[in-house]
Amino acid sequence: MKKGIHPTYREVVFLDTSSNFKFLTRSTLNSRETIKWEDGQEYPLIKVELSSASHPFYTGKKIFVDTAGRVEKFQQKYKKRS
């Protein structure tokens, strides 16, 4: 492998913003934000909206998503004109 062309693979903290769940793993993603982890060290912080801690498939909770407004808007926009 060529040196200097590959991204740095390091430990980062992912924060699920919807459930406030944090987990430490390794990634090549960059972030300007950092967070102090349980071991006392600072790691880059990557914020995500959805993870296994909040996704309905993994949690078993069913969440109703209100799409009625979008469907009605679509139907009005593309309804046949008689």
UniProtKB/Swiss-Prot annotation:
Keywords tagged on the record: Ribonucleoprotein, Ribosomal protein
GO terms under biological process: translation
Stored InterPro entries: Ribosomal_bL28/bL31-like_sf, Ribosomal_bL31, Ribosomal_bL31_B, Ribosomal_bL31_sf
Gene3D superfamilies tied to this protein: Ribosomal protein L31
SUPFAM superfamilies according to UniProt: L28p-like
GO molecular function (one): structural constituent of ribosome
Record-level GO cellular component terms: ribonucleoprotein complex; ribosome
Keyword Ribosomal protein applies: yes
Sequence similarity: Belongs to the bacterial ribosomal protein bL31 family. Type B subfamily.
Description of how the protein assembles with itself and partners: Part of the 50S ribosomal subunit.
Name of the protein in question: Large ribosomal subunit protein bL31B
Organism: Amoebophilus asiaticus (strain 5a2)
